């Protein structure tokens, strides 16, 4: 997945932020051109603001709180619908269903974003909640983690769905790799 340096193109940090968000909680929609929606709990307001800061040149409205189902309150922003996002949509969606592009290359920063969105530490393991993806996509993600970082892991059943579990030694190496990239307000995801 390569996105060129044309007018309106993204920096490497913006690109990594989008990749990590799409592997996590980010969502895209497309009519003529695609847009990215970033949405988290109001308790992660600082995290949404942090993501917004990097993508603000593509956003018209600052993040806002909204009321979800029941008592849930979220905090979100959307980028503008732009051609620069359309290739991401084509890469990550088939028939409006999110998938993992086989050409995806992970970077430490995209991995850090993905972990902040959908990662959890439990005992000596790190988990990536990949339940939204098909079995094939999850296997591809395991392959990418091994190819790009040398991390060993497996698919672990969480209730009735599978998710990625990094083995202890790989979990330690991943923690060392991404911890410097994680802002202090998200460090609770990676306790010492």
For the regions a protein language model found, what residue spans apply to each?
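Internal intein/HINT superfamily modules and their associated LAGLIDADG
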Residues: 1-192
């Amino acid at each position: 997945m390569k996105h060129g340096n044309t007018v309106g193109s993204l920096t490497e940090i913006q690109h990594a932020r989008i990749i990590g968000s799409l592997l996590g909680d980010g969502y895209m929609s497309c009519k003529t051109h695609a847009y990215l929606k970033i949405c988290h709990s109001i308790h992660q307001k600082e995290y949404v603001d942090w993501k917004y800061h990097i993508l603000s040149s593509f956003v018209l409205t600052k993040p806002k709180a909204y009321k979800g189902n029941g008592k849930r309150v979220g905090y979100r922003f959307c980028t503008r619908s732009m051609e620069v996002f359309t290739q991401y949509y084509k890469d990550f969606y088939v028939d409006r269903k999110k998938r993992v592009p086989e050409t995806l290359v992970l970077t430490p920063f995209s991995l850090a974003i993905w972990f902040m969105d959908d990662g959890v530490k439990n005992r000596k393991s790190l988990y990536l909640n990949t339940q939204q993806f098909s079995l094939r996509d999850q296997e591809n993600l395991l392959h990418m983690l091994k190819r790009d970082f040398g991390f060993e892991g497996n698919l672990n059943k969480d209730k009735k769905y599978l998710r990625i579990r990094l083995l202890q030694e790989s979990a330690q190496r991943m923690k060392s790799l991404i911890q410097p990239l994680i802002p202090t307000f998200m460090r609770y995801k990676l306790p010492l």
